[in-house]
Amino acid sequence: MANPLKIVVAGPIPRDTISTYENDIIMRYGCVTHPVIALSKLLDTNGVVIPVSNIHKKDIDGIANEFKEFSNVNLAGINSKKDRGTVILLDFKDQNNREEKQLACMNPIRPKHIKKHLDAAAFVFVPITDFEISLSTLKYIK
């Protein structure tokens, strides 16, 4: 395909620690990873998905591993320069109830993080709070 569809998915990729009600501990990356993978599967060879997120340096390899089987996911929008990502603790008390704690917040996504992706056909925003994507970024894209 000459001009594949390009979709940007912006927001945190938190390092999630999940404590199940059966006391199992699961470590995964969440939030933006889910729509990125879904869009990757939908687009297949007809497009590329670019997650845009600020992360901790120690999460670079783990996040790359999350997306390794998806050849149309381009990690050029992942930034660890400031070494500030999101960390979430999910503690399931039983099958239906959980406590969630945000232990660290990523630096917000600013226009400089989006600038090289303005040619995208679509932007998908997946913030956990109103802090992750600055208003100036939304105005910049508009």
Language model features by range: what are they?
Residues 134-142:
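Glycosyltransferases and closely related glycan-assembly transferases
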Residues 34, 62, 136:
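Short Gly/charged-rich anion-binding patches and loops
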